[in-house]
Amino acid sequence: MIEKAIVAKPKGLLKGVQSSSDSKGSPVKKSLEGKEAITYAKILRSRNKFVDALAIYELEKDSKNVEAHIGKGICLQTQNKGNLAFDCFSEAIRLDPHNACALTHCGILYKDEGRLVEAASYQKALQADPSYKPAAECLATVLNDLGTSLKGNTQEGIQKYYEAVKIDPHYAPACYNLGVVYSEMMQYDVALSCYERAATESPTYADAYCNTGIIYKNRGDLCLAVSPNFEIAKNNMGIALTDLGTKEKLEGDIDQGVAYYKKALYYNWHYSDAMYNLGVAYGEMLKFDMAIIFDELAFHFNPHCAEACNNLGVIYKDRDNLDKAVECYQKALSIKPNFSQSLNNLGVVFTVQGKMDAAASMIEKAIVANPTYAEAYNNLGVLYRDAGNIFLAIEAYEQCLKIDPDSRNAGQNRLLAMNYINEGADDRLYEAHRDWGGRFMRLYSQYTSWDNPKDPERPLVIGYGSPDHFLSYFIEAPLLYHDYENFKVVTYSAVVKADAKTNRFRERVLKKGGIWRDIYGIDEKKVASMIREDKVDILIELTGHTANNKLGMMACRPAPIQVTWIGYPNTTGLPTIDYRITDSLADPLDTKQKHVEELIQLPACFLCYTPSPEAGPVSPTPALSNGFITFGSFNNLAKITPKVLQVWARILCAVSNSRLIVKCKPFCCESVRQTFLSTLEQLGLESTRVDLLPLILLNHDHMQAYSLMDISLDTFPYAGTTTTCESLYMGVPCITMRGLVHAHNVGVSLLSTVGLGHLVAKNEDDYVRLAVQLASDVTALSNLRLTLRELMSKSPLCDGPKFIQDLELTYRSMWHRYCKGDIPSLSRMEILQKEELDVVQEQLHQQPNTSPQKLVKDEPADDASGPEHGPASKDNPLVLIKINGYNTSPSSITSPSSEENGVSQTRMLNCGDQCFRV
């Protein structure tokens, strides 16, 4: 257990949120009950999760809770259980006879039954609350329908239409119907005014324009018949075409959507909504220069369009122009101060910059502005993660998942965060991954057969998929040394912005006869189809649950054999992945850590490191000139747990005059620095002996920063990988510790492979002993530093050709098993399907055979656009969805740091709100 005394919350960061170690007051850990449960149920309803919301309402113990009865009724109503819904609304009315919401919903049920007279409940609702808009809208609809039903009685019908317009002056169908009646009565002037009013209230009301044209034609006014009010018609064409474009885009035809937007501008060249949506579409198509042009035009013609400013900020953020992004977000907020997306996005930028206090302030404001803003809680989790508070990070991710259980970002961030504190004492982390994988797999259809010839010795097609920057140090060897005659490489690169290294990799792959495909921004199901077309035999994903992963691609199971490797220290949890590549030190044969995948051990280390050409020379050990030992770590703050700090403090206290240097991005924030230092002071280490460095952007400068330390201290239970390799290559020996899980043992594998197994500790006391012992002989430390790079370069860790020979033998062994029908994932999926079938059959067997009397019909109402659909109470008002919203495809950017899991953000729905994957 981690001692509560040293779980320090950063000063100035998100006041009022408690550490998860104090579960008593935790908003996430506390069970849902009372008002909180009802609030959560309303959130679920707002996200159309009516079944889940109903389950919460069913648990409400207070039989006099009117809001619970109404909420339950609404959920039942959406499931076409009208009789049960009516009982709920009736009970609410019994408890509160003047409840406008309950009365309105009773009216809706009567109307859906065709009992328009009884639907006078709307009138009662208005009498109870004249300002209750849903009742007015629904009553207008009923009166309009009554007027139509009285077609044989013209005057009574007209009266009903006028009553509808009086109740809701903006109700266009009643105006239109008045026009029809007056046309039949040959009162064409009155009819024209009615049609014009209908068109004014609903500019896309085609029938109103058509009937207007007919009247003008019958009068002989052919010019007006062809173009009644030409300017209005052009504007309305622009509106209609823009809406049509958005409809096409949302249905998957983005090119047709763009064509409609452009056509809309032909009719109305200054229509800002069309420009705005063109900007959105071009952003989705990754044509960012065009997106910028149309977003700027949209803002020029509509200076109140905060959404356009926000979207510009998203693009500039993706292009690493953070100052310009901040300017755009601030401009959006000057227009809409409570614009939750821009508040959130500004918090994202500040988090990337390490300005944790400013980031916290913005994200908190976003949540205040929109309490159901799920991704803001996800970003809050990333903020806590970066600040080193994993417990609060996990709480924030879980809060996001409470609001949006399908949030992929929060779900995967939560799994990753749990690795930082998992010591392998139980199976909870495995179960969390397994459960996630089972749910995630159901979102995709799986391929279960392949055309790949089952010839055990034929040349194989090997597919690699990854977006990550740090992985380049470990993926270069396969791309360079594979035998392309027998192992043709296809690379699926999801890199956001190709740099010089990416271009070099591409050239090498293509020169050797391989295939390079850029898949950034392409739907994962389409990528899976590409993999099928490429006839990939073995597909290897390299990121697991880290940033911008393509596990959706793996969930489709496009290749006969699927493998996970390198980028994630645990199981993916996906039943569609056959194998996980590791070694006997990272995952011993007797490991108790469970995996969904079958473990395949390479004969040496499971990693092959290619040093950076920008590393520069090894510098002399600084203790020679300083006169004291400097310990250090460049791992991210999330890995430096309270227990790690306890051990480090013991080392520093045991080595007189020694110093500690730690480098990570959040140290540019004063509150994070002070929290870190105060924690060490509580452990007996003076803050004057600690140097904290913020992120160093340039790789050369980052590598040269190792010249400041004599001995590198590894983290646990999540050890370093890239940082350990960098440290060793720069001549800095590293102390690591053996553990029970893969994440803990990566350093064991790296050091043992290089020949430094004697620096692997068995436990915390041994860790302290080894560090103190190594620091006691500066001469030996200096000699080791001068020879360590050569020792590492000649070790199996950097022997690319030999590593690839072993890897190719492993691939061939997998293929032999496949040719014999041995497919681990298919066997696993068959077991899962059988288990699910058994559960369903058991549920059907236990389900009572009841058939309650129905009050309303099961069929949906004919007019799905009518205001009576989707009713809600005052606390849950009817929501009009703006169809011209921001709807971008996932895109991401990785922080240029040496940390293994770089920060990234994704543009999501709703005006480009950015969200972190870590």
Swiss-Prot record:
Entry's localization field: Nucleus
Polar residues compositional bias, start-end: 843-853
Pfam families hit by this protein: Glyco_transf_41 (PF13844), TPR_1 (PF00515), TPR_8 (PF13181)
Keywords attached to this entry: Gibberellin signaling pathway, Glycosyltransferase, Nucleus, Repeat, TPR repeat, Transferase
Keyword presence, tRNA processing: no
Induction statement: During vernalization.
PROSITE patterns: TPR, TPR_REGION
Annotated segments matching region Catalytic region: 408-918
Reactions mediated catalytically: L-seryl-[protein] + UDP-N-acetyl-alpha-D-glucosamine = 3-O-(N-acetyl-beta-D-glucosaminyl)-L-seryl-[protein] + UDP + H(+); L-threonyl-[protein] + UDP-N-acetyl-alpha-D-glucosamine = 3-O-(N-acetyl-beta-D-glucosaminyl)-L-threonyl-[protein] + UDP + H(+)
Cited Gene3D superfamilies: 3.40.50.11380, Glycogen Phosphorylase B, Tetratricopeptide repeat domain
UniProt superkingdom: Eukaryota
GO cellular component assignments: nucleus
Family statement: Belongs to the glycosyltransferase 41 family. O-GlcNAc transferase subfamily.
Name of the protein this chain belongs to: Probable UDP-N-acetylglucosamine--peptide N-acetylglucosaminyltransferase SPINDLY
Gene source species: Eustoma exaltatum subsp. russellianum
